[in-house]
Each structure stands twice: as C-alpha cells, then as structure tokens.
Design a protein with these regions (language model features):
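A short helix-loop-beta-strand connector motif used in the catalytic cores of GNAT acetyltransferases and
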Residues: 20-32
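Conserved GNAT-fold acetyl-CoA-binding loop/helix
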Residues: 1-21
C-alpha cells in the first residue's frame, strides 16, 4: 500500500495480509477493482457482516484504491455496482466507516446516497499509531 492510502487505513501490512487469509477461510466477500484496458488491480472492496447492528440483515463495506487512481470515478463505479447487487440480494442496510480526515471518502459515500450516522470519537488507531475519529455512514432502501 502507498502512503496516501495507508494514512486512512487502520491495519498494518501484516494485519491486511491476515485479513485476506481470513476472507479466504471464512468466505467473506472481496471484489478487486481492475482497469478495463489492462486488467491491472488498482483497488478492492471488502464486504463483511455489520457487527454493530443486532438481528438486522446488514453488511459493512470497506474499500481501498491505489492513490494514482484517486478522483477518477473508479471507486464510485465499483461501489455503485456492488450496492445495487447487495440490495438485489435483499440486504436491508449497508454501512461504511471513514476516518474523519478522509473527506474525499466521506463525499464519495454521500454522492452514493449514504447518510451520515455519527462520529465515534477516538474510534480507531490507524497507521503510525495515529488515533482517528471514525465517521459512520449507511444506506438503506427502507
């Protein structure tokens, strides 16, 4: 991961590798984002159960994009397609969390129709042991 992406990432490289192994073992969903003309992987979207909601058909998204491809619409296109697919599978609500400082990601979620739910102050220790406030967003068809 590049430095621009790591600053908004709560995992170390080792934790990220372990998460990939867990996904393979537990069959959680992960989508790679590829460039159409070269098939180069430029990012990923991870889908997991929303563990903050109880007895609700809810999933949580997290996503990463190589900084060379920021602000080109790639993540918007990928998330839009995934959200449509999840709602077709009768998911009730989809959540996402972003660090307070990650204004571009917050704007992306809002553009996709997510609503701001609130802030967990000092919610996540991220890269280089920096503690971040964590913004919560969700989208629902209900």
């Amino acid at each position: 991961n590049d430095m621009a992406t790591l600053k908004f990432n709560a995992m170390t490289k080792y934790e990220f590798a372990e998460m990939i192994r867990d996904i393979e073992r537990e069959h959680d969903m992960m989508y790679c984002i590829e460039l159409k003309n070269s098939n180069n992987v430029i990012g990923a979207v991870f889908i997991n159960p929303d563990r903050l909601r109880y007895r609700v058909n809810a999933l949580s998204l997290s996503y990463y994009l190589d900084c060379r491809y920021y602000r080109n619409g790639y993540m918007y296109e990928a998330l839009q397609a995934i959200i449509i697919k999840l709602f077709e599978q009768e998911i009730d609500i989809i959540s996402a969390r972003v660090f307070k400082e990650n204004t571009a990601s917050a704007r992306l979620l809002e553009k996709l129709g997510f609503q701001y739910e609130g802030c967990l102050r000092m919610g996540v220790t991220g890269y280089q042991e920096i503690v971040h406030d964590d913004f919560f967003y969700s989208i629902s068809l209900l």
